[in-house]
Regions:
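Jelly-roll (double-stranded beta-helix
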Residues: 1-187
């Protein structure tokens, strides 16, 4: 969408934008953005040509994604062919969720999932997640180590207390948020 061709010709554009809550000690670090080229994202071909998984952050089967974060997370972008099935292993103490972008899934042989749905898995219970695509499906599977801190959100800010929210708005109004630096990985 930043290319001259896209600007001139238009077309469909789809993205998933994620905001990751930071530990309290890191909330006031300077903002940043990671521009990651698709060529730097490992692609895992799933068994029996059933689909593929792109490891954007974290690790899957020995492949490490290029995105970095302040606390341990996994961000996997997956696709499964119709009637394909795969079991994903996730860290036992992570919070895990699946966002279905397209298609239809059956999770753990019991939960039917429709497009534009989010599934939140029970922590410490579901470390083996079986996914069956009843249609060609695209999804994002995310896991993260719980911060175990209070959360207070309002508008674009997520802090730990209401007072910190007020301070964040005040800092923003006063221009204290600085410039956004782009961390780009280029060959």
């Amino acid at each position: 969408f930043h290319s001259p061709e896209f600007a001139q010709q238009g077309g469909l554009f789809e993205m998933v934008q994620l905001w990751i809550n930071l530990p309290a000690k890191d909330k006031m670090t300077p903002p940043s953005y990671q521009a990651i080229q698709s060529t730097h994202i490992p692609v895992i071909e799933l068994p029996e040509q059933s689909g593929q998984l792109r490891v954007i952050a974290g690790e899957y089967q020995g492949h490490t994604g290029p995105a970095t974060s302040f606390s341990p997370i996994n961000l996997w972008d997956g696709a499964l062919a119709q009637n394909a099935e795969h079991t994903f292993t996730v860290p036992p103490h992570h919070t895990t969720l699946l966002v279905l972008l397209e298609g239809e899934l059956l999770i753990n042989h019991r939960q039917k999932v429709q497009p534009n749905s989010v599934v939140l898995f029970e922590r410490n219970q579901d470390t083996q997640i079986n996914v069956l695509a009843t249609q060609h499906s695209r999804f994002v599977l995310l896991t993260g180590e719980p911060l175990n801190e209070p959360i207070q959100g309002y508008g674009p800010f997520v802090m730990n207390t209401e007072q910190e929210i007020f301070q964040a708005f005040e800092d923003f109004k006063q221009g204290k948020f600085g410039q956004l630096k782009v961390a780009e990985k280029v060959n």
